UniProtKB/Swiss-Prot annotation:
The keyword Hydrolase is annotated on this UniProt entry: yes
Catalytic center residues: E59, K134, C166
Keywords from the named record: Hydrolase
E.C. numbers: 3.5.1.4
Signal peptide boundaries: none
Sequence ranges assigned to domain CN hydrolase in this UniProt record: 13-260
Functional note: Catalyzes the hydrolysis of short-chain aliphatic amides to their corresponding organic acids with release of ammonia.
Lineage: Bacteria, Pseudomonadati, Pseudomonadota, Gammaproteobacteria, Oceanospirillales
Catalytic activity: a monocarboxylic acid amide + H2O = a monocarboxylate + NH4(+)
Family: Belongs to the carbon-nitrogen hydrolase superfamily. Aliphatic amidase family.
Protein name per Swiss-Prot or TrEMBL: Aliphatic amidase
Length: 348
């Protein structure tokens, strides 16, 4: 894995991430104009970064945040649709893959139900090869309908890619799910705002380290009249070290070459920090020395995960017992979220 050049090779995937300035849009026509701007940016970037195999744009970069619910429903896209057609044409012309945000994608029961928050991975032939719907929307603010699974797709030069979105990345479970499905590069597109800059930079690095995987983060920048976005789009090696990171600048770009052979060699031959292998071969050294086989223990030792899988309602009740029983909070109401029932306070 290398940083500082504009090239790539048969063994390296050239990945660019963009601090796209958060747009403030109100209509389908404005969304399509912005999509065309993104398309032109891709073509320009390819001239400057001839090794670029994959370009990643942040969450909300296509549509912005539609703070008006009627505008959000009116601009919700179909996939494929007008927006993806623009992106597909740009990927073909620039001979590159791209990750793009659709906020939102029409629900199957549109307009009766809220849209999804969706990413698409488009290959260099203009084909949509992965569509991911955000599993963990940023409640209580985001009103997206949640998705229900992650995916892994063979990307440029065979690198295996998963997509996640913003608040998804605050939950170690989703990173592990992607990695255990075989993802070598986890792409996190986010529209993350202050104050949580330090926490988000730290989370991406920690999850790369914990999952022996590359991480590409594309985050919004600028101010949209409501939130201030901190940028810091970054590329992180599978050892948790940052290869390149933007600052807060609008339209900042970082680029690095991610080696396919190096991550596969590390996953096969690293030992003390091979977290994926060791999690499913717990204590293999001591068990081997004890004459109890050479595979360690594969069984899950974590009671919470057992309960969640076997009895999700019980797991929900358990977490409510230590947090709260309503989705709203009486001391700081958000919208019309219900706050019936007694809320916990410090010391109770």
């Amino acid at each position: 894995m290398r940083h500082g050049d504009i090239s790539s090779s048969n063994d390296t995937v050239g990945v660019a991430v963009v601090n796209y300035k958060m747009p403030r849009l109100h209509s389908k026509a404005e969304v399509l104009d912005n999509a065309r701007n993104i398309a032109e940016m891709i073509k320009g970037m390819k001239k400057g970064l001839p090794g670029m195999d994959l370009v990643v744009f942040p969450e909300y970069s296509t549509m912005g945040i539609m703070y008006d619910p009627d505008e959000m429903m009116a601009t919700a896209a179909t996939i494929p649709g007008d927006e993806t057609a623009i992106f597909s044409a740009a990927c073909r012309e620039a001979n590159t893959w791209g990750v793009f945000s659709l906020t939102g994608e029409q629900h199957e029961e549109h307009p009766a139900k809220a849209p999804y928050n969706t990413l698409v991975l488009i290959n260099n032939e203009g084909e949509i090869v992965q569509k991911y719907r955000k599993c963990i929307p940023w409640c209580p603010i985001e009103g997206w309908y949640p998705g229900d699974t992650t995916y892994v797709t063979e990307g440029p030069k065979g690198m295996k890619i998963s997509l996640i979105i913003c608040d998804d990345g605050n939950y170690p479970e989703i990173w592990r799910d992607c990695a255990m499905k075989g993802a070598e590069l986890i792409v996190r597109c986010q529209g993350y705002m202050y104050p949580a800059k330090e926490q988000q930079v730290m989370m991406a690095k920690s999850m790369a380290w914990a999952n022996n995987c590359y991480v590409a983060v594309a985050n919004a920048s600028g101010f949209d009249g409501v939130y201030s976005y901190f940028g810091h789009s970054a590329l992180i090696g599978f050892d948790g070290r940052t290869l390149g990171e933007c600052g807060e600048e609008d339209m900042g770009i970082q680029y690095a070459q991610l080696s396919v052979s190096q991550i596969r060699d590390a996953r096969a031959n690293d030992q003390s920090q091979n977290h994926l292998f060791k999690l499913l071969h717990r204590g293999y050294t001591g068990m081997h020395a004890s004459g109890d086989g050479d595979k360690g223990i594969a069984d899950c030792p974590f009671d919470f995960y057992r309960t969640w899988v076997m009895d999700a309602q019980k797991a929900q009740e358990n977490v409510e017992a230590m947090t709260r029983s309503t989705i709203g909070v009486a001391e700081c109401p958000v919208g019309e979220l219900p706050v019936d029932g007694k809320e916990r306070t410090a010391g109770e």
